[in-house]
């Protein structure tokens, strides 16, 4: 009888811990997963229904940090064999962000479902100044402008430590400016990530819509590594105003600034 009583007590305690798991546990997990670069500060509530302030930093021990205004609110519930995450953030998320999280054996899949036919693919917009929290080179560039994210459907899956990306996502950079240039605005840009249905490699494209600072480039995310090559240049008449910025962006080769990652 005592054994059954003890077993019941342990099971009850385990259920209570799962149901009332504090949001701080989720915050700790996010900090560990991102190397301290993305934080849920002042986390309140539980893992299942909570809120926090979103903060970017340059990593553990860094003095650089930047927080978004207001609080991110979320709910997490069961959806069959998966988890359904719903998030709202008045400053930045368009309506409600819905994600489906599918755990598995040595794998985890996060899905952004396609919106209903005719519905907007916009997910939200964030201030470019938020990136300053990541430290170098953003704290030197001091960017301003808006980052608009949209997607018709996207999924990221980690399988035994290897990331596989499918679907499409587009980041529009609007009215970008920097303290390193005397120009009021550098330009407008788009960065596209196109996943591979086979999961081999996701293609990345960077282009300029308009502006004095011309940016182009391409790359791919493959085998959990980012490889990107691009170039930056000044539109005619803007060379002097952009000279310092071009020196910082990449390796100078005449009028060009060459960008290489990975």
Go through each PLM region and give its residues.
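Short, well-ordered strand-loop elements centered on a beta-strand within folded domains, enriched
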Residues: 81-89, 105-113, 165-169, 202-206, ...
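Alpha-helical transmembrane signal-anchor/signal-peptide segments
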Residues: 23-42
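Solvent-exposed beta-strand/coil patches in large extracellular/periplasmic or lumenal scaffold regions
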Residues: 135-137, 141-218
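Extended terminal
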Residues: 2-7, 27-33, 181-262
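Hydrophobic membrane-insertion alpha-helices, especially the h-region
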Residues: 2-22
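Extended amphipathic, helix-rich lipid-handling scaffolds
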Residues: 104-156, 192-204, 233-262
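Transmembrane beta-strands of outer-membrane beta-barrel pores
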Residues: 56, 103, 116, 175-177, ...
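N-terminal beta-strand/beta-hairpin edge segment
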Residues: 38-140
């Amino acid at each position: 009888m005592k054994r059954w009583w003890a077993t019941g007590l342990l099971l009850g305690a385990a259920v209570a811990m799962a149901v009332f798991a504090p949001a701080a546990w989720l915050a700790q997990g996010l900090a560990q997963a991102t190397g301290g670069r993305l934080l849920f500060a002042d986390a309140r509530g539980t893992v299942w229904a909570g809120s926090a302030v979103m903060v970017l930093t340059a990593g553990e021990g860094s003095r650089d940090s930047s927080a978004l205004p207001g609080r991110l609110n979320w709910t997490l519930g069961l959806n069959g064999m998966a988890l359904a995450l719903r998030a709202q953030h008045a400053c930045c998320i368009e309506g409600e962000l819905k994600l489906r999280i599918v755990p598995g054996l040595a794998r985890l899949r996060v899905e952004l479902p396609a919106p209903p036919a005719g519905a907007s693919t916009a997910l939200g917009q964030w201030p470019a100044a938020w990136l300053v929290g990541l430290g170098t080179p953003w704290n030197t560039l001091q960017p301003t402008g808006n980052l608009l994210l949209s997607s018709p459907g996207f999924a990221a899956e980690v399988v035994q430590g290897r990331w596989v990306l499918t679907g499409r996502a587009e980041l529009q950079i609007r009215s970008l400016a920097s303290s390193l240039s005397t120009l009021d605005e550098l330009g407008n840009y788009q960065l596209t990530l196109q996943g591979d249905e086979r999961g081999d490699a996701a293609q990345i494209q960077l282009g300029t819509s308009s502006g004095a600072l011309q940016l182009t480039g391409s790359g791919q995310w493959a085998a959990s590594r980012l490889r990107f090559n691009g170039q930056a240049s000044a539109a005619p008449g803007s060379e002097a105003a952009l000279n310092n910025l071009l020196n910082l962006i990449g390796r100078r080769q005449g009028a060009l600034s060459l960008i290489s990652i990975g």
